[in-house]
């Protein structure tokens, strides 16, 4: 093994040890420590450990934030772990389960070849009265166009997207989450 391989193994081991020790001792870490641990586990592809870190963050009443939450969902999906991405969404407080987090999870499901789950997430999002952005439509349409099972939904989504484009031209205020999903 190379020196870099040993270094990576040691860093992962020490990060796991730090997390386990804090859990065992009942110690709540600072937000930056949780984020550093999550980053180490993401880089080493220890994705289930990332979820453990996020659970502890939530217990310690630290917030991932809208951006980090959506990025985490996206990265877990990129690691081909859609179930962990869905779990990450569930761990977010309701006020952070917004447009960017839902769009990220839809992208995960589309990438995993499960457009029906992406459509279910769209339904949940609409039930919470969160309106899709142009980026949300792009994600859905790119995945649904590859399958013949959702032709009616694809047509409907395309009409909604065109309507949103027309109304967005006259909108003066663009929300942060809309910018993230563009």
Curated annotation (Swiss-Prot):
- The answer to whether UniProt assigns keyword Hydrolase to this entry is no
One Pfam family name from the record?
Answer: PPR_2
The keyword tRNA-binding belongs to this UniProt entry's keyword annotation: no
InterPro entries for this protein? Pentatricopeptide_rpt, PPR-containing_protein, TPR-like_helical_dom_sf
**According to the UniProt record, which cysteines are disulfide-bonded?**
none
Q: Which family does it belong to?
A: Belongs to the PPR family. P subfamily.
Q: What is this protein called?
A: Pentatricopeptide repeat-containing protein At2g01360
| Organism of this sequence | Arabidopsis thaliana
């Amino acid at each position: 093994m190379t020196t870099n391989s040993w270094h990576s193994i040691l860093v992962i081991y020490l990060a796991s040890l730090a997390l386990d020790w804090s859990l065992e001792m009942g110690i709540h870490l600072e937000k930056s420590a949780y984020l550093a641990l999550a980053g180490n586990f993401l880089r080493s592809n220890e994705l289930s450990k990332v979820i453990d870190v996020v659970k502890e963050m939530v217990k310690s009443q630290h917030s991932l934030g809208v951006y980090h939450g959506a990025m985490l969902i996206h990265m877990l999906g990129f690691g081909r772990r859609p179930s962990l991405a869905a779990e990450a969404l569930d761990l977010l407080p309701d006020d952070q389960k917004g447009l960017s987090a839902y769009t990220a999870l839809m992208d995960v499901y589309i990438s995993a070849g499960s457009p029906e789950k992406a459509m279910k997430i769209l339904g949940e999002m609409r039930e919470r009265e969160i309106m899709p952005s142009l980026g949300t439509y792009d994600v859905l349409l790119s995945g649904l166009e590859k399958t013949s099972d959702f032709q009616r939904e694809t047509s409907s989504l395309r009409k909604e997207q065109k309507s949103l484009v027309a109304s967005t031209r006259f909108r003066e205020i663009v929300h942060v989450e809309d910018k993230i999903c563009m």
